[in-house]
Amino acid sequence: MGDLSLQRAAGALGAWVSGVGLADVAESDRVYARVRQALVENEVLFFRDQDVAPQVFAAFAQCFGEVLDHPAYATTEQSDAVQILESTPENPSKIELWHSDMTFMAEPPNFTLLQGKIIPAVGGDTLWASATAAYASLSPGL
């Protein structure tokens, strides 16, 4: 485990994380605290090259609180805390349009985690938007 390093990904939100992995966060309270603070400040964090088992991904997720399941998705065989979002001709995506994760719940989660396992060379983009920045940019009259 190295030192946590952040590189801004865009103006409104997001940062690339290097120097620590998902397993490091799950194993170290100090690393978790730094990553959580970075997440709060940047709203989206990107960890590159994290080909971890579902159990490790679940342990990482559980650091941030209770893991909620989405009723539309199956879980992995290795962990009930990790679900599979698939988009193939046989199983097209259920979330092709803009959405905000789990906002149908009375108390939606604070964070959402996504790990890309099989990603197409073209297309398949996932985009993020900052509701914080959008709200802050509203005119005072609104």
Regions flagged by a language model, labelled:
Residues 1-142:
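Non-heme Fe(II) oxygenase catalytic core, chiefly the N-lobe of the double-stranded beta-helix
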